[in-house]
Amino acid sequence: MLIRNILEESVQKFGEVKAVKWLNRKEVLEKSYSEMMKNVISTRKGLLAEGFEGKHIALIGTSSVEWIESYLGIITGCTTAVPLDAALPCEELIDLINRSDSEALFLSPKHRPYLEAFLANCPKLQKVWMLQKEVEDLPSGVYSICLLYTSDAADDLIGV
């Protein structure tokens, strides 16, 4: 039985059962098999529509529901998943993307600083998708405050 068959059977039998749970700050979020399958199908169809049938697609990211859905979208379609260790340095990831003949990449926001290097050094790479929406660095209700120092007439430092 193929993974695609197992996944589709799980959705039929357990559609509303929670397939994954994860912690987002202090809130426990969850997704059912049916909810996940919608994103898996969207990923699969999107890859085919963009001409990636039969191609190798790399994934670099930490454990997340988006990573799982992307991975399942790749392996249940006509594409080959190349999951790469997110802890590897940029140079090694570039080497693996090239050696695997990956033509597209799913990338976590944590690895966005590597994006320019990937695009410059991976000639087969045609498309990159970010795995998660970027979250603001500051939680809501927190403000940046800056204290500048200058000197007064007596050359004493004063905060302004």
Regions found by a protein language model. Give the residues of each.
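Short amphipathic alpha-helical/adjacent loop interface patches that line ligand
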Residues: Y33, V40, R44
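Structural motif detector for alpha-helix initiation sites
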Residues: I3, S32-Y33, C90, I145-L147
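AMP-dependent adenylate-forming
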Residues: L7-K31
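Conserved small/polar residues in nucleotide/adenosyl-binding loops
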Residues: Y149-A154
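Conserved AMP-binding/adenylate-forming
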Residues: L29, R44-L88
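Structural core segment of the AMP-binding/adenylate-forming
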Residues: T76-I145
